[in-house]
Design a protein with these regions (language model features):
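Ser/Thr/Pro/Gly-rich low-complexity disordered regions
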Residues: 1-187
Length: 187
């Protein structure tokens, strides 16, 4: 009689280390805009030149067991947040953004919305990387990026003196005027 015994070979994996950053992929459309009130236009106009931001996700394990160093292809549960609110739940953003769901650009957001001058937008990205080696999900969260618009209105200048706004001048106390009078008359 042959007795078979099954033995498990356990492998210990090093933990996954991750690095995340945000990269603007559109040099013609930066995070900041300029609003020209005379022509009623945004520079750049994101309806014409949209802004694309990529969350770059890098992952590695010290033992070399992780092969996907650029981990964007593996991202799951991707969400972009506008001022700490999920962008998918905001009606003011409906149809004004798209999120890439395939390839090395997975997770990249393309924004077609102009930011009003009075509004500041803090944008950040959250997702998970499934680590199949040990069966856990590694959470990913980026730093925030600020989207804002500068008003290009005419500058208003004002000139003032740092002293009393009402200047008082008494010619009788002005000794220079007395000196000029004496020199002119030979006194």
């Amino acid at each position: 009689m042959i007795i078979e015994s099954k033995k498990r070979i356990r492998r210990e994996y090093q933990p996954l280390t991750t690095a995340v950053s945000l990269k603007i992929l559109t040099p013609a459309s930066p995070a900041g805009q300029i609003y020209d009130p005379e022509n009623n236009e945004y520079i750049p106009d994101r309806e014409i030149t949209p802004l694309t931001i990529l969350p770059q996700v890098f992952a590695d394990a010290a033992d070399g067991s992780w092969t996907a160093h650029v981990a964007n292809r593996l991202l799951a549960s991707m969400k972009w947040y506008v001022n700490n609110v999920d962008i998918a739940t905001l009606p003011s953003w409906a149809g004004l953004y798209s999120i890439e769901s395939t390839g090395d650009l997975r997770g990249a957001i393309t924004i077609f919305r102009n930011v009003p001058v009075e509004e500041k937008i803090e944008l950040h990205f959250e997702a998970v990387i499934p680590d199949m080696r040990i069966g856990v999900n590694i959470p990913i969260k980026t730093e925030t990026i600020l989207l804002s618009t500068l008003d290009k209105a005419e500058d208003t200048y004002e000139l003032s003196i740092g002293d009393d706004p009402v200047m008082k001048y008494n010619p009788f106390y002005d000794r220079l005027l007395m000196y000029d009078y004496k020199v002119a008359n030979g006194i």
